């Protein structure tokens, strides 16, 4: 929303003296710089797109296919031997407590995948005002007279208008354009409920209850204890397995132009047209004004500085994967696998006090005591292109004092015809060869690619500690234990640099 005072319509008169129609209001309105920087604030354009995609899969109902319980197939029952068959105490206990059903006690298996795509594009322009959005007082049209003395037509107003430097560098500040694109893609997968597979719990099938023997059956003290505390669900005590993958793509392009201002956006006082006389002594027609106008070096090199254009593109891609919660598949605690117990030596084996303590507190989950396994891959691609033009200035943008025409004599002593003026004109080398230097164009491209991968936390996959000789001391034994529970992160870095330089001489 622009300035409401610029919208055509009836003027809104303010109080006398301090309103927008007063002397101060007119002066501020004409000099408040309605340029795109709005008093130093850079123009900014931001575009942001967000795409959220969520996919959820729920499996419920009866297990499909002919892989169900054969006991449900119509036909004569097959009794097993007494005591150890499926109808015995142990068979009933195992059948009722293995609970491999997809609902695992009514909870349906659920898989949620969520993808979030955020794309943001930002463009910042600083330095030179772009296009016709400059100072409105420079637009051709009827002049708006201000109050005498302090208005834009007074001595101070004319001096400010002519010397406020409407050039693209705005008093030395280089024009800069930065474009930045950020692409964030995050994918999260959560698995809750029962492990997938059609091997349901037959005890949930409608039918008569099968009571077990007293004491050791599922209704006895041991059965109830196992059923409540063994928690063979994939959530391992309620914590759902979670896998998060996050990709961040940042692309930034920056262009800086230094040296000569491009195009006809230079100093307006150089444009052909009628001269605007200023007040005597301090205006552009005075001794100091003429000296500054002739020696401020409007050449493309701006006093020897070569025009330079730098374009820099940075591409950063980072991928992070975190796995938390329950280990998937058969990588859980081996002590939960059905089978005969393996007795160890007395005292220090898995059945001793220390073994039982370690087995219960060693946290066989992939987090290894809470530290989640994390894999981070980061790729950085930096491409920089630099172009430098030296030698002859291109086109008719050289020193205006070399253009054929009548000489403009300055005041005696300090003008261009005086001792100082002649000295400056002869040694500033405005010739196209700059004292013999040939015009040269150099283009240089640098491409740097860096890839870094850091793996911390629990090692993924079926990696197990390799057998090692027994520790020689307590310190070595403690060091091995600490490395097992807190592995050091492993970092891998790769870097490649590609430099291309092209030189063109005329």
UniProtKB/Swiss-Prot annotation:
Query: Which terms are listed as keywords in the entry?
Result: Activator, Host nucleus, Host-virus interaction, Phosphoprotein, Transcription, Transcription regulation
Organism of this sequence: Epstein-Barr virus (strain AG876) (HHV-4)
Post-translational modification note = Phosphorylated by the cellular protein kinase cdc2.
> Which InterPro entries would you find in this protein's record?
Herpes_LP
The free-text function statement in the UniProt record for this protein reads:
Plays an important role in the establishment of B-cell immortalization by acting as an EBNA2 coactivator. This transcriptional activation preferentially enhances the expression of the major viral protein LMP1. The interaction between EBNA-LP and host SP100 correlates with coactivation of EBNA2 and the relocalization of SP100 from PML nuclear bodies into nucleoplasm.
Gene (name only)? EBNA-LP
The record's subcellular locations are:
Host nucleus
Q: Which residues carry this modification: Phosphoserine?
A: 35
Sequence similarity: Belongs to the lymphocryptovirus EBNA-LP family.
Q: How does it assemble?
A: Homooligomer. Interacts with host SP100; this interaction is important for EBNA-LP coactivator activity. Interacts with host HAX1, ERR1 and HSPA2. Interacts with host PRKDC and AKAP8L; these interactions modulate the coactivator function of EBNA-LP.
Provide the protein name: Epstein-Barr nuclear antigen leader protein
Region annotated Disordered sits at: 1-471
Q: Does the keyword ATP-binding apply?
A: no
| The keyword Transcription regulation belongs to this UniProt entry's keyword annotation | yes
């Amino acid at each position: 929303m622009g300035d409401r005072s610029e919208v055509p319509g009836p003027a809104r008169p303010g109080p006398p003296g301090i309103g927008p129609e007063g002397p101060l209001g007119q002066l501020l309105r004409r000099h408040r710089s309605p340029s795109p920087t709005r008093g130093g604030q850079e123009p900014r354009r931001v575009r942001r797109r967000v795409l959220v995609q969520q996919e959820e899969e729920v499996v419920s109902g009866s297990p499909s296919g002919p892989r169900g319980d054969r006991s449900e197939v119509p036909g004569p029952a097959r009794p097993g031997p007494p005591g150890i068959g499926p109808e015995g105490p142990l068979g009933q206990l195992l059948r009722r407590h293995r609970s491999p059903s997809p609902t695992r006690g009514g909870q349906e298996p659920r898989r949620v995948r969520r993808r979030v795509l955020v794309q943001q594009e930002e463009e910042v322009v600083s330095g030179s005002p772009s296009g016709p959005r400059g100072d409105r007082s420079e637009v051709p049209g009827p002049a708006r007279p201000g109050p005498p003395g302090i208005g834009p037509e007074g001595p101070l107003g004319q001096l400010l208008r002519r010397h406020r430097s409407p050039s693209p560098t705005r008093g030395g500040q280089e024009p800069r354009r930065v474009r930045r694109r950020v692409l964030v893609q995050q994918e999260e997968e959560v698995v809750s409920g029962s492990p997938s597979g059609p091997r349901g719990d037959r005890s949930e099938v409608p039918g008569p209850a099968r009571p077990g023997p007293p004491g050791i059956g599922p209704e006895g003290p041991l059965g109830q204890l196992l059923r409540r505390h063994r928690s063979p669900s994939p959530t391992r005590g309620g914590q759902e397995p979670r896998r998060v993958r996050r990709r961040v793509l940042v692309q930034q392009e920056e262009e800086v132009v230094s040296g000569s201002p491009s195009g006809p956006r230079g100093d307006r006082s150089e444009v052909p047209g009628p001269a605007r006389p200023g007040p005597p002594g301090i205006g552009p027609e005075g001794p100091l004004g003429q000296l500054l106008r002739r020696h401020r070096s409007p050449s493309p090199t701006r006093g020897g500085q070569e025009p330079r254009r730098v374009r820099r593109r940075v591409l950063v891609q980072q991928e992070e994967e975190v796995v938390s919660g329950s280990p998937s598949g058969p990588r859980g605690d081996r002590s939960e696998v059905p089978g005969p117990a393996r007795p160890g030596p007395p005292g220090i084996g898995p059945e001793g006090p220390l073994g039982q303590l370690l087995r219960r507190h060693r946290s066989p989950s992939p987090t290894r005591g809470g530290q989640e396994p994390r894999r981070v891959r980061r790729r950085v691609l930096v491409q920089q292109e630099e172009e430098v033009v030296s030698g002859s200035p291109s086109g008719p943008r050289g020193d205006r004092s070399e253009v054929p025409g009548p000489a403009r004599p300055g005041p005696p002593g300090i003008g261009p015809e005086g001792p100082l003026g002649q000295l400056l004109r002869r040694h500033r080398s405005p010739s196209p060869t700059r004292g013999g230097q040939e015009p040269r164009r150099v283009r240089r491209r640098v491409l740097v690619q860096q890839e870094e991968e850091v793996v911390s936390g629990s090692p993924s996959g079926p990696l197990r500690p390799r057998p090692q000789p027994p520790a020689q001391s307590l310190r070595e034994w403690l060091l091995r234990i600490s490395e097992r529970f807190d592995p050091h992160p492993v970092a891998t870095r790769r870097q490649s640099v590609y430099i291309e330089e092209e030189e063109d001489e005329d």
